Structures are given as C-alpha cells and as structure tokens.
Amino acid sequence: MEKTSFSHDTNKVFLIAGMQWGDEGKGKAVVTFSEKVDIVAKYNGGHNAGHEIILNGQQYKLHLIPGGVMHPHVINVLGHGMVIHLESLLKEMEILTQHGIEVLERLRISDRAHILLNAHVDIDRKMEHRRMSGGGKIGTTLRGIGPCYSTKSARTGIRMGDLLHWEHFSKKVRDFYKIHCDFENFEELAQEEVENHKKLYDIFAKCICDTGYFMSESIKAGKKILLEGSNGSLLDIDMGTYPFVTSSTTLACGAYLGLGVPLNAPIYRIGILKCYQTRVGMGPFPTEFFDDNYTHIQKDGTEIGVSTARVRRCGWLDLVAARYIQRLNCFNSIYFTKMDVLTGLKEIKICIDYRNKVDGTILERGRFPSTIASLEEYEPVYQSFAGWDQDISQISEYNELPETARKYIEFVEKEVGAHFQWVGVGQDVKSIIVRS
C-alpha cells in the first residue's frame, strides 16, 4: 500500500468523493479542508443530496451550495455537471444569510449547467407513481433530478446560459412544456415557470459564467481548489447498484466531466468512507441488519436523510464494495468517518467477502456484481472484531484510541489498500484525528 499523505502546500487541487451510498460525512470533510483553499467546486448532482454540518455548535444543512461557503474567503462554484433548481438555491442562500453567511458575491454558476424546472419535479412524481403501481419503485427523492438529467441527454433541456437571453429562454420553456408535460393547462404552467424565473434571473444572472474557463485559469494561477462530489460512488449511474442509483457520475472522474477541469490537472483524490454502511430508500444492501445493532447505529449516528428526512437503513461495513470503489477511484488517502458511533458495541462485524449461495465460491476481490439478480446470488462473509466502551469523541491523537478501535481501523485500511490519513470521532468538524 502506497502512503501518500495529503498536504495543502503540495496538493493544490484535490477532490473529495464518497465511497458508499452517500451520507459518508463528505460535508464535514469539505468544511474541514476548505478552510485553507480559494475555491470549492461541485461537479455533479442537484438538491437531492444533502450535507449536515456542525460548526462551532451550530447546525447547517446544505444541498446545492458547496461546503466552502462556511469560510468567508472561499469562491463557490456550481459546475456544468450539476442540475440546479434555482428556487431551492435561493431558499438555501436565504437561510445562510440569516446566519450571517454571505453567498451571492462568492457564487459562480456554470452557464452550461442545466436548469431543473418545476416540470421536472412533476414528471418525477408521475414516473415514481407509475413504477409503484407496477411494483418497481426506485425510492427517488422526488426532486426532479432524474428527469432533468434525462432531458439533458434527450437534448431538450434548458441551460443556465439560456437564462441570459430572455426571449430565447421564454420560448424554450414553452417548448419544453409542450413536449414533456401532458397537462391540460400546460401553457398556463409554462407561463408561471417563465415568470418565476424572471425573478430568479434578477438575483442570479451576475453569477452565471463560463466556470470551465474560470477553473482552468484558476489552476494555472496556482489557486488552491477543492472539488466536491455529491452522493456516493455506489450510486454512480454506470458503476453503482443500478437501477437504484442517482442520475449522474459520482466517481472521481466526474470532476473532469462536470467541471471542465483540464485532463492533465494533478488532482489528489480523497475518499470518504464511513465505518459502517447506510442507505436511504430502495435498493440492495447485503450487510443490512435489523437487530439491536440497528437501533444503536441509527440513534447514535443520527442516521436520518438531510434531504428527505427518511430514516436510513444501516448495516456492517462492506469491504467487497469498498475494494471495488477503491479500484474505480484510486483514492490517494481516505477519511474514515464516525468511529465514535461504534462505541458501546460488544462485537463489530465487517463483510470481507461475498460467497455464492449455491456453490460456495468467493467473488474475486475488486469485483462487484453488475446486476441486482447477480448480487442476490451472494451472501456476505463476516469477520468479527471486539468493540470498545471508551468515549473517543474528545480524542485528538491516534495512539490514544482504544487498541480494539485501532485494530479495526488498521484492518480496514490494509484491506482497502489506501492510507487512512484521517479518522472522524465526533459530529463537530473539529472532531478529527490526523494520522501521520
């Protein structure tokens, strides 16, 4: 295992991405690392994803706005790989402003990012209702993300740059409703959408720019830049647990695709891995449990979705999935989060392999089943570890952790094959252990 420790001085452009089904603790990591950067840029997703951040005892919830907004010197970029519901962006911005956090002057929105219309939300609800009646519910957040990416691929979507040419934008909105909305009053709804976006245009027009060029020039100028991924790698549209995935590229390569970062840019990649597994909504979950361990993890980990308020499903850490995601992303270092949540468990299990239920063969390490049907052919193989009772939330030195906690961390580190440089031991952004 190569040990390449991260340094703000050496690694001026770096990336943070989740290694599971989201909710790994990326928001806390972004706020921690963005204190010393000039720019934080998001490259995928929309207001379906959420970060819950606790800074100096105050709780903040972010969906569209990058975590760098918590630091007054940081420019925050929404890249062209995102789909942006401007009304939700405004609401989020207003809440931050109430807490004394200025956003607008430090916000850059890609002119190539797609606008998520209210029509996309209506389409999403109708599609999920049809799937539910057919027994094929996906568990979408019902925020229009999938339909917006769909119209992007169908080349009927509307981009931020269109908003800067008002007559052109108004026509595109009306054409969009005519093509995609089977409502009797679609013309009236289209007009409402246009009028709503006129107000939003007045607020956000000055933020819309060529962010790809901005990013390239910033890299050339030697700016310190954090690239922020939404959702988690197991939700990637191509490599995740399809169809129970999101509609964008959530892997590290998405930073190049969704921000226009030059392909020769030296990006240091940081993976965020939670010490247990969680999932929101439908989809396969091989290591899920329903016993007292669930009660402990769900309660102590506050495992409730930031965007949907849905209670998260919980399970043991899945190393089959983690090794697979590490193979795809090649993270240089990993931030291992929420170790404090495991405190009090007598026994902690880790899934180390998948075993075929019929012939007992073990799935090759680094692989992950490509379909739900093939995944169901396997069962998890567990290895057990002793737990600990000591409160670790105030510990700042690695060697002060209980020996059993260190054994757990070091086993996972060896199996994943990347340096675990940071360990999260509490909710606050300052509750972190840095390993040499």
Swiss-Prot record:
EC nos: 6.3.4.4
Record: residues binding Mg(2+): 23, 50
A GO molecular-function annotation: GTP binding
Subcellular location: Cytoplasm
Keyword Metal-binding among record annotations: yes
Cofactor comment text: Binds 1 Mg(2+) ion per subunit.
Binding site residues for substrate: 306-312
UniProt xrefs under InterPro entries: Adenylosuccin_syn_GTP-bd, Adenylosuccin_syn_Lys_AS, Adenylosuccinate_synth_dom1, Adenylosuccinate_synth_dom2, Adenylosuccinate_synth_dom3, Adenylosuccinate_synthetase, P-loop_NTPase
First-tier enzyme category under EC: ligase
Cofactor requirement: Mg(2+)
Catalytic activity: IMP + L-aspartate + GTP = N(6)-(1,2-dicarboxyethyl)-AMP + GDP + phosphate + 2 H(+)
PROSITE patterns the UniProt entry points to: ADENYLOSUCCIN_SYN_1, ADENYLOSUCCIN_SYN_2
Miscellaneous section: Parasitic protozoa lack the de novo purine biosynthesis pathway and rely exclusively on the salvage pathway for their purine nucleotide requirements.
PANTHER family (alphabetical): ADENYLOSUCCINATE SYNTHETASE (PTHR11846:SF0)
Assembly notes: Homodimer.
Protein name per its UniProtKB record: Adenylosuccinate synthetase
Gene source species: Babesia bovis
Lineage: Eukaryota, Sar, Alveolata, Apicomplexa, Aconoidasida
